[in-house]
Amino acid sequence: MIKVAIATNINFYKSTLPIVISSLIEQGIERDNIHVFNAGFDSYDYQVIDGIHYHRLDHNSYEYSPLIEIVDKQLESEYWFLVHDTCKFGPNFKKLLYNIPEGAIKLSLNNKPAMTMGTYKYDYLLSVKEKIMSIRNTDYSEESMNHWKIWGVPNEDYIMWMTEPRPLIYNDDARWEVADNDNWFGTNTQRRTEYYFSLDLYKNKSNWGQSPILKRTI
C-alpha cells in the first residue's frame, strides 16, 4: 500500500490544496490514501473530511514536516509518497507511482536534487527517526523560517539522497523539462512548471536557482 503525504503550510494551503487534491482524485488515488500535513499551527489537530486525512501540525520544517509527523505519530503504511502541494499529475501517474520494484526502500522522483519528493518505505523512515526528528522546527519567527529555508538548499534530499542507502530513480527515468512559466495560483510571484517523466508529474516552482534570495511566497 502507498499513502500520499502532501506537504503544505498555514500560509499556502488555501491556494494549493484545491489543485493538488483534485488532481490526485482525478488520477484515481483513493481519498483514504491521501494525507494532508499542514504545517505552522500552534496546536495539533486531526480530522477526516470527505474521506481525506488532514493533519494540522504544531511544527514547520517545510517539506520535511510530513516525514516528521509520520515517524513521530507512527502513521503506518507500507510506503509513503511525499509530494509538495504545488504539484499536479497526468493520466499515467497512478500506474507509474505503483511501479515499485520488489524490496525497494526509497524511490526518488529524479536524480539529486529531487526536492525530497518520492516514495519511502515506512520501516526505513522509522530506522532514521532520530535524524528526521532532529530537524523538527517549532520556531515560526521570520529569522527561524529563513534559517531553515536556507539550510534546505545544501541539505536538499536530506533523507532521500543524503542518507544511505541510495534510492532508486522512479521507473529508471530521470528526464525532466520546463513545461511553461505559468503561475497556477494567480499571484505575481515568478514561477515555472517543471515536468517529470518518471511519474507524469508537474511541479510549479518559485525557486530554481534564478535568484540568490529564496522565495517564501505562493
Where are each of the predicted segments found?
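ER/Golgi luminal nucleotide-sugar-dependent glycosyltransferases, focusing on the catalytic module
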Residues: 1-218
